[in-house]
UniProtKB/Swiss-Prot annotation:
Keywords tagged on the record: Cell membrane, Membrane, Transmembrane, Transmembrane helix, Transport
Keyword Chaperone in annotation: no
Topology class, membrane: Multi-pass membrane protein
Family according to the record: Belongs to the autoinducer-2 exporter (AI-2E) (TC 2.A.86) family.
Any one of the GO CC terms: plasma membrane
TM region positions: 34-54, 55-75, 84-104, 158-178, 212-232, 240-260, 274-294, 310-330
Name of the molecule in the record: Putative transport protein PH1000
Length: 355
């Protein structure tokens, strides 16, 4: 039995082949769906794998970006790998110094703060002419605040191993980004003028953020040193150490500069200098951290990046709210790039309407 026939135009039609071709459409659709499921699953697993290390990965990229000019100069003299190793070792030395300072200075303070909060729980509020229900509600709020404070202190104590792991990942990626700087630069090199302008906006914002970050953190350290001297927390060497710690902590995702003035204020209150402790807390909150991060920083970044300071503030607050400390950098960059993309889209629309 023949399985084909000849059409009038001379083309042979194979019945079996036609049946397979008819099945080919649905078969290809199923195959495409399965392929996309596999791709999405792999991407989701990759994101889940990288997500715990996203913060050190992100800050490693920022550090490598900031060290890039120095890396280029060193590369000309000692080579790319040697330059990357030297800079990574320098960062490792800084990380070890910070770890030692944390162990020998903050650990006793955290322990004392925990004991102080525990003692506060035993205090009973007794205010004349105030209903017991109000006092009971107030005690409940205070107890909740104390429990959260104790939980935060415990989390700081157990954060040292996490800090070490993040430092290892951070330094590894810094070295990788420095060694592979040529490949990374080629990866974000485009010929399309629109993409080039968008990348330049992101680059300009990132440069502004890094410059302002460095400048502001140095000023924070100076102000913290002055604060420790003004409120008589310590002598000059310890005050200078507090300033250096403020600068260093401002670069660490896990910590921040406010921890230094908080420790100083707690020390003053424990010594009985309550007014001085409150004064240092107000001074630190207003001039060191976190208020300057959301007032002075947006204005400086906006001026450097030629961007609206209100949008920078929105980017910083929204980024921090959604992404933590790294959102201070990601938020303004995303907004600036998004606005540049909107401008390019409007230009394309205008050209289309004219044509």
């Amino acid at each position: 039995m023949r399985t084909w026939k000849m059409r009038k135009d001379g083309q042979r039609i194979d019945y079996l082949g036609r049946k397979w071709r008819n099945l080919g459409g649905p078969f290809m659709e199923v195959s495409r769906v399965v392929t996309w499921i596999i791709i999405i699953t792999l991407v989701a697993l990759a994101i889940k794998t990288i997500l715990p290390f996203f913060s050190p990965l992100f800050f490693a990229f920022i550090t490598a970006y900031a060290l890039y000019p120095l890396h280029i100069k060193l590369k000309e003299r000692i080579g790319s790998k040697n330059s990357a190793i030297l800079l990574t070792l320098f960062l490792l030395l800084g990380a070890l110094m910070i770890l030692l300072i944390l162990v020998y200075t903050l650990t006793p303070v955290i322990g004392q703060a925990y004991d102080y909060l525990t003692n506060l729980e035993k205090i009973k509020i007794n205010i004349p002419l105030v209903p017991k229900s109000v006092i009971s509600s107030l005690e409940g709020v205070i107890d909740e605040f104390i429990e959260r404070g104790k939980g935060y202190l415990v989390s700081l104590t157990f954060s040292v191993p996490k800090y070490l792991l993040q430092v290892i990942v951070y330094l590894t990626f810094v070295y990788f980004f420095l060694v592979k700087e040529k490949e990374a630069r080629e990866l974000i090199t485009f010929e399309d003028e629109k993409l080039i302008r968008i990348i330049e906006r992101g680059n300009l914002t990132l440069q502004a953020l890094i410059r302002v970050w460095l400048l502001l953190n140095i000023v924070k350290g100076i102000l913290m040193t002055l604060g420790f001297l003004i409120f008589k927390v310590s002598n000059l060497p310890t005050a200078i150490l507090a300033g250096l710690l403020t600068v260093l902590f401002s670069f660490i995702p896990l910590f921040e500069g406010w921890m230094i003035w908080l420790a100083g204020a707690f020390y003053l209150v424990k010594q009985g200098h309550i007014i001085a402790g409150i004064g240092l807390a107000v001074y630190g909150f207003t001039l060191v951290s976190p208020l300057p991060d959301f007032t002075i920083r947006p204005k400086l970044v906006a001026r450097e990046a030629e961007f609206n300071d209100v949008l920078v503030l929105i980017g910083m607050i929204g980024g921090t709210w959604g992404l933590g400390l790294k959102g201070l950098i990601i938020g303004p960059i995303v907004l600036n790039v998004a606005i540049e993309m909107l401008r390019e889209w409007k230009n394309v629309q205008a050209k289309t309407e004219r044509s």
